[in-house]
Amino acid sequence: MISREELGAKSAELGVDPSHVQQDYVAGWILAGLYGESPLGRQLVLKGGNALRKGYFGGTRFSEDLDFAITDRVNPAAFLDALNDVGRLAQARTGVQFHLEHTAQIGRERIKGAQTVYTFGMSFTDFYGRTETLPVSLHMDVTELTRLHLSPQSRSLIHPYSDHADCTADLTVMHLDEVLADKLKCLLQRQSIRDLFDLSHSILFNDEIPIDRKSVVSTFLRKTIFSPSPAAALNLLAAIPFEGMQGQWDDSIVCSRETRQDLTDTVTRWKDELRQLFADFRLGEQGQLAFFPAHLRTPIMDAGAQRKLLRLTYKGRTRLVEPYALRFKRREDGIGQEYLFIWDRTGGRSRPGIKSLLNYRIDDLAITDEPFEPRYEIELAKAGELTERPTFSQGPRHRTHTRIATRRPRPRPRRR
C-alpha cells in the first residue's frame, strides 16, 4: 500500500480529496487482479470513465466506479467469488484491508429486453486507519449481453503510483472510438456534465492519442436511432443547455488542477467541434421531422426526471399528461418516426389512457409544478436507443430496414 505521506502528497499535487486517490489506487489493484490473475478477465471489457482513465488517458477525471461489458450472461455468484479472490490478492500485496465479508451484489437493473446490469460492491478500510468513518466503497457495474460495434483494444494498466511496477496488467478495454460514441449517446440521453468533460478532454485537449472523428460519429449513429438523420443528432447535441451547469461542473468533476478547464471556454470549443465531428455526414433537412426537436425534447426529459406533469396542445386540444418514453417506431407502411408515449389525463376524443404523440402535432408544451406518481417505468433516459417496443410491457422487436418521415403527412379529407 502506498504510504500515507504519498497519499497526502498526491492529493495535494492534484488538488483532490484523499478519498478519490484511495479509490483510484484500489481500482488499479482490482483491475490488475481481474485481468492478470482471474479467469474472469478474459470475459470482461472495461468501459466508461475508468476505461478512459485506466486505459487511455491517465490525466483525465477520476471515476468512482468500474464499468464492464460482457457479451455473455453474468453469473453473479461466480463474479462475487472472483472479486473476493482478487481482494485477497490485493490485500496480500498492498496491505489494504478489504472487508470481504461485505462484498455483495447490491443492484440489478433490466435495461432492455433480456439485457441486465448487475452492480457489485467492495469495501476497504480508510488508508489513515480511521475506524470512526465508514469503510471506503468501490462499485462495479457489469452489463451482460453487450453488443460491441468495434473490437476491444488491449491497453496497459495506467497506475500513477510508486508501486506501479508491481501493479501491472494488459486490460481489455472498449475501443476508444466506441467509448466516445457511448459518451455522445449518453450526452443526449442524460445531458450529464461528466460526459461533456470526457468528450472534451479526449477530443479537444488530448494530445496523446489521435482520435478518428469519423469513426466516433459513425459508431454513435449505429448505436442510436439517428443513422437516417445525422443532422437531427447534431442539432440536439448543439442545443444541450450546458451554460446553466456551472455548479455541476464545479462539484461533480474530480480532476487535477492541470486538467480542469473553464466551462464557458469548453462549451464554446465543443460546439465548434461538433460541426467538425459531423462534417463527413449528410446534414440536410431530410428526415429531421421524424425526431423530437430540442425545444420539445428538453422539457420532456426534464419533466420525466422531475416527475412533473406536462401541459401541451395536441391537434388543437390542451392536455395534461404524464411523460414516459420517447421511442422510434415503424408503422405498417415502413415510415419510421419518434413517438412520445404519455398517459393522457385529459382524454380528448377518447378516455384518459396511454397515447403516442408526434412532435409536429404539438403546438405548445410546458412543464407544470404538479408532480405525478408514475404508473409505469419512466424510460425517457433511454431515448435514442435502438429499440422498437410497441407497448410498455412487450419486448423488443428485431431491427429491420426503416424509412423515416421526411415531411408532414397530408391531412385526410373529412367525410361529409
Predicted segments, located by residue:
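Glycine-rich beta-strand-to-loop/alpha-helix junction loops that act as flexible
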Residues: 46-50
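Core beta-strand-centered patch of the WYL/Sm-like small regulatory domain
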Residues: 135-151, 156-167, 289-416
